[in-house]
Amino acid sequence: MKKSGFIAVAAIAVFLLLGATWASALDPIPEESGFSGFVRPGVGYLKYKSNMVASIQGFDLSKEKNDDRNDSPDSETTALVTLPFNLAYTFASTRTQLFFGTDPTDLMRFDLSQQIGVKQGIGSLGILQGGFLFSGTPAKVWKDPYLEGEDRDDTKRKSTGARLVWDRIFGSFFQVQYTYRKFDIDSEKSGNSIGSLTSSDRKLLERDSDRQSVDLSYRFNFAKNHNLAPAFIYTHDDRDGKAMKNDAYDFQLTYVFLERGNPFSFTGNAYLGQADYDKRNPIYGKTQEDDRYGIQGTVYYENPWGWSLFGSRPMNFFVGGAYAKTDANIDFYDQEAIMGSVGVFFKW
């Protein structure tokens, strides 16, 4: 989040727990052979509104009982804990790196997937990366999110897929990324509780999906120690249910302040987008449209005592906050997240 709305809102929340990355730029391949990686534990507070997502990592994100399917969702508050990591081994002579772990792009989409893949330097042409994506801890959604007046049952949402990235294209700071994901909901019962719907109507609400996305971004310096990275993301979410099928268009802007010798650094991120759906929703009698936006900021501080973990670089603390919202033309699909988080970052 995909229901386009809830993915977009949850994206900012989990993105914040990680801290913003430099527009998802690939890390340079080390000059020496050996192991490298990072671990970034964090805890956070999340106030979240959704009628679609049940929980993540055992943390509840929406209420079991929905009293009126024509209303916007009530808010739910929860703590969150994350432990993103990455482990890599570099073969310096061939400019090849094998890696396994958490991809920040997937955590941004509230997916908690893992990736195993290879990164290859190709000289002046840039860096290529390919990876296989699979579910780590599947999110849980409601079997029938439209059930009224009774406790709803949840079900797992699993995913597999692949990602290709070409970064630093011809020595520039331009990056192209393509991702394919297949999403399966274990027990899909959307609309089963509504007796007036036909079997064809319920078919329109199914959420299993083949999703493709293309991300285009460019990173540049606009002043000393200040960097910007605009990005455009197009997503085609081909859901089994044509009322759930959608095309999404998002513009994202990332800002980074990083100064050598300064223990403080800052990252900020803002996005604005919309999603257009394919067919009329059989429950609400109109075709869904979403407008979504969000903003977040994270401050990092390198500890002055040189604390490290098993030979890592000096540990960094981070603290941040975020707000994100999806405003749908159907109130039931509205989404909102308010978040704060703290954590530490170790890199080898």
Each model region followed by its residue ranges:
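Transmembrane beta-strands of outer-membrane beta-barrel pores
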Residues: 43-47, 91-93, 102-106, 132-138, ...
